[in-house]
Amino acid sequence: MAVSASAEIEMQLSGSAGDWTAVTSDARRQGPITAKYGILSSEPMRFVGDVGTLNFELDNSEGNSAKMLGYYAPDHACCLTGFDIGTPTRLSITYSGSTFYKFTGRLDSVEPVPGRYRDRRTVCQALDWFGDADAFKLRLLEVQVNKRADEALDAIVSSMTKRPSASSLSAGQETFAYCLDNSRDETTTVLRELKKLMDSELGYCYVVGDQSTGGLLKFDSRHVRPMNHTLTACLTDTDLVDAQVSRRTSNLFNQVRLVAHPREVDDSASVLFTLQSTPQMAPSTSMVITGRYSDPGQRGLSRVGGASMIAPCPATDYTMNSAEDGGGTDLTTNFTVAASYGGNSVQYEVANLGAVPGYITLLQARGRGLYDREPVAAEQVSESSVDLYGERVLTFDMPYNDDPLVAADFAGYLIGVLPTPSTRLEQVEFIGNVSDELMTAGLVVEPGARVKLTEAVTGIASEFFVQGCEVVLAVDGTIHFKWYVAPASSALYWILGIEGASELDETTILGY
């Protein structure tokens, strides 16, 4: 090998505030150690990272560093203290005096292989922050009013129990009148909400490595890539050990339909939730009740968002009575009601402080309803492409974009880059140990970086943006790097007011 680098798998065995402990010496080398993160696809219209993974095996036999059988089996008496699912885990690579944290996450699966006389190993997989984002459901997060994508993203991340190690959020280009209003708390994950935000902004969100902590959550607005002309690396076919190329009809679209969602907003407060039952509460007890907002005209059938929610008022928003039908003694003053309002649901904490049981005969939530009733589609067609290749339709939803003109602008941009065939370089792979240049490229380049790739057989000689990365520590000690790439030409549009932005309609097209 021309150059070498050292890799470490480390864990925080005493919690997220503790020191990092290396377990590299016990990593089994019968198979590779593999880390993947970022957008693991070159497909167009992919703006959000996939769940990143780190896969490795640990020596669970007496031959490990502790000389203990079961050292990496959580139910074994000799298990390493702190080793279990949820343990923070990272992969770092040190080269030429610099350390790069390529993956940071938490153990998601720990599977000891049973059998005293078999291959005593523990198969491990860690997930990056997107694993938490894919599991955590939005809960009682308020509607975001007149917020950019980065501001809404920050509000979402701040609501989570597990947050990324660090974040770098550029200022979004769109200000959304309303967002987080058309989600459903009970089913919508953070990852799904990130997709809705990015699809509306047309920006990118992924996790990248760095030289500080790794696991950096990054948001690039839709203007970041067109304004980034700095090449981080240049590779040719002599550097590559593998590349994947495609030229398919499925890669082109000649009819583009972008869907915007104008909102209807109540001028004044409406009743968005009414409790349909009359539960009885014993003295000195409490109860939690969750209500979901719906269209007052289609009660319970059409979910809506709610803004400017009003604190519950006795007699108006809640009443309690000794009789189920409300015809007995008014007990409202015996009760307290606290409401936590979200963008599409409310959670009540109701307490009966009295000495007698009572029925909840009225419980309702009032606020300004937000209605997503009539989405508007903006369409663009390339007739010449349709004549040649038939109809290839792309329908794309922009849930928080309420302006059909913005959708029309983006449709006009897409119809300028998608209707003609193109040879798509999807992935490239190279071995870092071949040269200093390649090792440096593999360690420095992260999702969002601009690179130049040349391949003689296919005739490809273009610039690309790296979408996602894969790092493989092979059994033979070499370090393989794989990049998932998207053509930089798809970001070659003109942002008005930027000097040297090329010739409109010749080497670039109007931005949006």
Predicted features and spans:
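Assembly/oligomerization scaffold segments
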Residues: 1-147, 151, 159, 181-202, ...
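Short edge-strand/loop segments of extracellular domains
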Residues: 221-226
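Acidic, low-complexity/disordered segments
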Residues: 123-127, 138-142, 324-409, 442-512
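Extracytoplasmic
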Residues: 51-53, 102, 119-121, 253, ...
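Short, well-structured beta-strand/strand-turn elements
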Residues: 163-172, 199-215
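Extended compositionally biased segments used for macromolecular assembly or nucleic-acid engagement
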Residues: 131, 159, 169-175
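Polar, glycine-rich mid-to-C-terminal structural blocks
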Residues: 243, 251-276
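Surface-exposed aromatic
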Residues: 173-183
